[in-house]
């Protein structure tokens, strides 16, 4: 047995012994009929106490004589004979408890409290005071065991240094790591701020189907399921776009949805097969209006949630108080690869040679627009560190976007990038039903040629367009990638509570 295996065996034995001792304590509680009480009520949380009383002196607290009831997990305990100090952790943070034998009834201190374990859920009532070292604390006059923890806190044995354990057992990560708790508190605040921003702009929040007969709205491989009662295959949605635009046809001229999308694709630091998107659609607007709205959205969220328009991400600094950089796709390619001539990108043979020199494998179904897009992905995308709008996407890779009036090869579309990754996508919507039908046919041909990410033909959506879609602009924002930026997280798993993981054997 190696030294590492020996250490692992010893840790497992220690854990088993610890759990056995805790189970015996629980058995005693069951025998007394007080194993899992549910009659304790708290009236405040640690963060509220710190907010209200951190500025109060010892004398002021004594004069106020504030009685409180708190509950949470016992994280640390220092027993000093007839008195102990406990660190209690709740959703808002931590507060210190002072527990003295003479302040409790019926020998609770010796017979109960001293036998409790770290990780147990407890409730306490007492008076606020400040210790000799100046720490805000609660002088307890009653304390109760609410839930017996059978497993020890994660850091007692092997800790949570293993990233996979943090993702698989997020509850342990949240118990042990304040940084993780803060990340998800920030995520919640950002979602609330986004909704507030959208409502203030006159948008109505809606919900559209998560299971669809025809998946649409994006080029991606869908998950397939089966509806037993209807006896039909259905798809988990890859995007809500076509349903949201049906609502615009119906007269809801400003709509948005924040919800999950599902794409049967790989997992990476940037990709999770189940992810959160916000999509919005606004009638009587174009992609240029979306650019202004996007800049305002990021500026507002940054200012309202983080308190500044300047965001630090790794060693990069983003100032959302400034306009984003703007350039076309071809301009970006030539900017980051000056050796590539813009004119060559408009020639299929020359563009294919450029792509092949970059290691791009050309598929038979690709046209010039797809080749250009692949060249952009290879040469420019990772270089777009500062907030940047890339415009003039080819129609071939934009089957739902309106063609440009001056150049029908391209569309009135942008994607925006921050930190070298795509964050969102917006365009003036295609509202020509006949053009949309033709583009769906092109997608069907691409699918027949082997492109399993090509779109399906959605006949009902074409019918909806035939009833008249007002001039409309639509935007999609990757919420998880947005969260990565605003929480300085460098993998998408750090901002998704329960990311996709391969099952353990």
Curated annotation (Swiss-Prot):
Protein name in UniProt: Lysine--tRNA ligase
A Pfam family annotated for this UniProt entry: tRNA_anti-codon
Cofactor note: Binds 3 Mg(2+) ions per subunit.
Entry GO terms, CC: cytosol
PROSITE patterns with a match to the protein in the record: AA_TRNA_LIGASE_II (PS50862)
Disulfide cross-links: none
Gene, per the UniProt record: lysS
MF GO annotations: ATP binding; lysine-tRNA ligase activity; magnesium ion binding; tRNA binding
Known EC number: 6.1.1.6
Keywords attached to this entry: Aminoacyl-tRNA synthetase, ATP-binding, Cytoplasm, Ligase, Magnesium, Metal-binding, Nucleotide-binding, Protein biosynthesis
Annotated positions binding Mg(2+) 2: 422
Subunit description: Homodimer.
Catalytic activity: tRNA(Lys) + L-lysine + ATP = L-lysyl-tRNA(Lys) + AMP + diphosphate
Entry's localization field: Cytoplasm
Record's keyword annotation contains Lipid metabolism: no
UniProt: Mg(2+) 1 binding residues: 415, 422
Organism: Edwardsiella ictaluri (strain 93-146)
Lineage: Bacteria, Pseudomonadati, Pseudomonadota, Gammaproteobacteria, Enterobacterales
Primary enzyme class: ligase
Cofactor(s) of this protein: Mg(2+)
Alphabetical GO biological process terms: lysyl-tRNA aminoacylation
Family: Belongs to the class-II aminoacyl-tRNA synthetase family.
């Amino acid at each position: 047995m190696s030294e590492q295996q020996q250490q692992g065996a010893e840790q497992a034995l220690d854990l088993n012994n610890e759990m056995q001792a805790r189970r015996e304590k629980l058995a005693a509680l069951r025998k007394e009929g007080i194993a899992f009480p549910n009659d304790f009520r708290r009236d405040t949380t640690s963060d509220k106490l710190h907010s209200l009383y951190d500025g109060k002196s010892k004398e002021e607290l004594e004069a106020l004589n504030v009685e409180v009831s708190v509950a949470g997990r016992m994280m640390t305990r220092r027993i000093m004979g007839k008195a102990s100090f406990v660190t209690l952790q709740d959703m808002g943070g931590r507060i210190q408890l002072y527990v003295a034998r003479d302040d409790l009834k019926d020998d609770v201190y010796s017979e109960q409290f001293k036998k409790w374990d770290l990780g147990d859920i407890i409730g306490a009532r007492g008076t606020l005071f400040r210790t000799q070292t100046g720490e805000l604390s609660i002088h307890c006059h009653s304390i109760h065991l609410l839930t017996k923890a059978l497993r020890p806190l994660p850091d007692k044995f092997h800790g949570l240094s293993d990233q996979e354990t943090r993702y698989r057992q997020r509850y342990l990560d949240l118990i042990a790591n304040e940084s993780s708790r803060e990340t998800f508190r920030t995520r919640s605040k950002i979602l609330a701020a986004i909704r507030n921003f959208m409502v203030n702009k006159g948008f109505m929040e809606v919900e559209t189907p998560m299971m669809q007969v025809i998946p649409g709205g994006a080029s991606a491989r869908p998950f397939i399921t089966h509806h037993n009662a209807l006896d039909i295959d259905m798809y988990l949605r890859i995007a809500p776009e076509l349903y949201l635009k049906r609502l615009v046809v119906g007269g809801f001229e400003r709509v948005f949805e924040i919800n999950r999308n599902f794409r049967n694709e790989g997992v990476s630091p940037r990709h999770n097969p189940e992810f959160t998107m916000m999509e919005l659609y606004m009638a009587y607007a174009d992609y240029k209006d979306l650019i202004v709205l996007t800049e305002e959205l990021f500026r507002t969220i940054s200012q309202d949630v983080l308190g500044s328009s300047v965001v630090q991400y790794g060693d990069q600094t983003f100032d959302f108080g400034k306009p984003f950089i703007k350039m076309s796709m071809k301009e970006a390619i030539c900017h980051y690869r000056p050796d590539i001539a813009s004119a060559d990108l408009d020639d299929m043979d020359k563009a294919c040679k450029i792509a092949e020199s970059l290691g791009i494998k050309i598929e038979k179904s690709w046209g010039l627009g797809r080749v250009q897009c692949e060249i952009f992905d290879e040469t420019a995308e990772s270089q777009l560190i500062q907030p940047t709008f890339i415009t003039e996407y080819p129609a071939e890779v934009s089957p739902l976007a309106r063609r440009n009036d001056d150049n029908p090869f391209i569309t009135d579309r942008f994607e925006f990038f921050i930190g070298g990754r795509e964050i969102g996508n917006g365009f003036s919507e295609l509202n020509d039903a006949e053009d949309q039908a033709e583009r769906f046919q092109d997608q069907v041909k691409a699918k027949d040629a082997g492109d399993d990410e090509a779109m399906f033909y959605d006949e009902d959506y074409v019918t909806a367009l035939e009833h008249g879609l007002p001039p409309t602009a639509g935007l999609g924002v990757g919420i998880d990638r947005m969260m990565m930026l605003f929480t300085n997280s460098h993998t998408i798993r750090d901002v998704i509570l329960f990311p996709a993981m391969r099952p353990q054997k």
